[in-house]
Amino acid sequence: MNTQSQTIVVKLGTSVLTGGTLKLDRAHMVELVRQCVQLKKAGHQVIVVTSGAIAAGREHLNYPELPKTMANKQLLAAVGQSCLIQAWQSLFGIYGVDVGQMLLTRADLDDRERYLNARDMLQALLKNNIVPIVNENDAVATNEIKVGDNDNLSALVGILAGADKLLLLTDQSGLFTADPRKDPKAELIKEVHTIDETLRKIAGGSGTTLGTGGMATKLQAADVARRAGIEVIIAAGSAENVITDVVNSKPQGTKFLPVECALESRKRWILAGPPSKGSIVIDEGAVNAVQQKGSSLLSKGITEVSGHFVRGGVAKIVNTKGELIARGISRYSSDDLSKILGKHSQDIYAVLGYEYGPVAIHRDDLVLI
């Protein structure tokens, strides 16, 4: 066992928890718990991001069909979440380990203060030797405040926790060169250094019957987590000792290597926190200044602004081809930027009648993608 203490986020998809059936596979769940407890005994910290609330609710109520409406999904999630946490509490209790439930929505991560509060709560659970059991609060979350899937939620939890590893367990053995269910020649991709369009096309977008995540969402999660300095592994939840093997650096699934320079706390929030409300198009000179020189974004380099965001809102920064360059917190609203785009910094006051400084987005508030 690796003796260096690590923080590991283990994301368990619905297909892993149900074994492809319509109810929780508690026999397999206890085996996953055993491995998590083994890591804890070795000095590691473990966080479980669990799916399965709707499946658990459907099982408990003997619900006759798959839920189609938001109301029915939330009803099943409300009933199922209590069943799910009871199952985890019972299984970890076999080994004398306490668990604590955290239910999150996008809104908890969008607001900086709530983000920090969630981070503090997560750290408090870990410091008190309690295993956090995290899920999205599906019973109350609307489309506007949903993270959307537990793959991306697990990446955000990894950022909150300052995790070393994120393990995405699924019903597939990792990322393949093609869909292994359709192409017998598909080969497992064992290691990924860069996530590009080729990989995104390979990942596709299929999910499972009761789940919301497919390989495409796992790739999104891996991209976010690795930019925050977290190693990500996609592996089969049914593989023997998959959790303990990954921590011991034994080959399992597909490994995504983290970027060399991990982001500081505030920039991690920019990456993980609020969704972008608009886009800022910048010219070639500004792209070079931001990417190569690490400069702040000036209004002079902006050619177009779309969407609507307020001062302090997060915006996407793209080049003239529409390619994503960065995300950043704007010091001016979208309306203001539309008026001062292409203008020199010294002209901002003359145009607006006020100013919030010479830069549109300061380099400390900007994360390269």
Curated annotation (Swiss-Prot):
Under Enzyme Commission nomenclature, its number is 2.7.2.11
Task: Extract the signal peptide range.
Answer: none
The domain of life for this entry's organism is Bacteria
Q: Which InterPro entries match?
A: AceGlu_kinase-like_sf, Asp/Glu/Uridylate_kinase, G5K_ProB, Glu/AcGlu_kinase, Glu_5kinase, Glu_5kinase/COase_Synthase, Glutamate_5-kinase_CS, PUA
- Amino-acid positions noted as binding ATP in the UniProt annotation, renumbered to this chain: K11, T170, D171, T212, G213, G214, M215, A216, T217, K218
Location relative to the cell? Cytoplasm
Enzyme class label: transferase
Kindly state which keywords UniProt assigns to this record, in alphabetical order: Amino-acid biosynthesis, ATP-binding, Cytoplasm, Kinase, Nucleotide-binding, Proline biosynthesis, Transferase
Q: What pathway does the annotation place this protein in?
A: Amino-acid biosynthesis; L-proline biosynthesis; L-glutamate 5-semialdehyde from L-glutamate: step 1/2
Which molecular-function annotations from GO does this UniProt entry contain?
A: ATP binding; glutamate 5-kinase activity; RNA binding
Residues annotated as binding substrate: S51, D138, N150
Q: Which PROSITE patterns match?
A: GLUTAMATE_5_KINASE, PUA
Q: PUA domain spans which residues? A: 277-355
| BP GO annotations | L-proline biosynthetic process
Primary location recorded for the protein, binned into one broad class: cytoplasm
Provide the reaction this enzyme catalyses: L-glutamate + ATP = L-glutamyl 5-phosphate + ADP
* Pfam families attached to this UniProt entry: AA_kinase, PUA
GO annotation, cellular component aspect: cytosol
HAMAP family assigned: ProB
Q: What this chain does, per the record?
A: Catalyzes the transfer of a phosphate group to glutamate to form L-glutamate 5-phosphate.
Q: Which family does it belong to?
A: Belongs to the glutamate 5-kinase family.
Question: Which named protein is this?
Answer: Glutamate 5-kinase
Species name for this entry?
Aliivibrio fischeri (strain ATCC 700601 / ES114) (Vibrio fischeri)
User: Which gene is the coding source of this polypeptide chain?
Assistant: proB
